[in-house]
Amino acid sequence: VEGYKEFIKEHYEKPIREMEEYFPVICGEWCLFNSLACGHDTKGGQSVLNGMEEEDDRVLSDEERGEIYRELARAQLEAWEKGSGYFYWNYKLLTDTVNDSGWAGWDSWDLGRCVDFDWFPVKK
C-alpha cells in the first residue's frame, strides 16, 4: 500500500498542485480498483470478460481489502482535492463478487458498494 501511496503523491498530487496554479485541473474517471486488493495482477483491469480468469494468488480477508481501499481512498482524495474537482468512475456492478472468484476485489468499481462497505469516506 505504501508504494501506491507514494506513487499517488509523487505522480498525481504534486503535478496537480503545480498545474492548478495556472489553470483548473479536474481529474476524471478514477476509482479504488487495484491489483493489490484483487490478490493477483489484473494487467491493468483485465477481467473474466476479457478472458482473464486467474485464481487468486493471495486471498485477502474483507478486513485487509477494506484497509487497502480506505488508505488508497484517502491518498487519492488528498491528491484530487489539490485540483478543482474530480469524477469517480461509477460503474454499477451487477455481478456476484462474493461467490464468483473471478470477480474478487472488483467491488471498488462501484461507488455505491464502496460507500456501503465503508471504503470511501462520505461527508455527512
Describe the function of each predicted region.
Residues 1-74:
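Extracellular glycoside hydrolase catalytic/binding regions
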Residues 55-59, 63-124:
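Aromatic-rich peripheral "rim/lid" segments of glycoside hydrolase catalytic domains that contact
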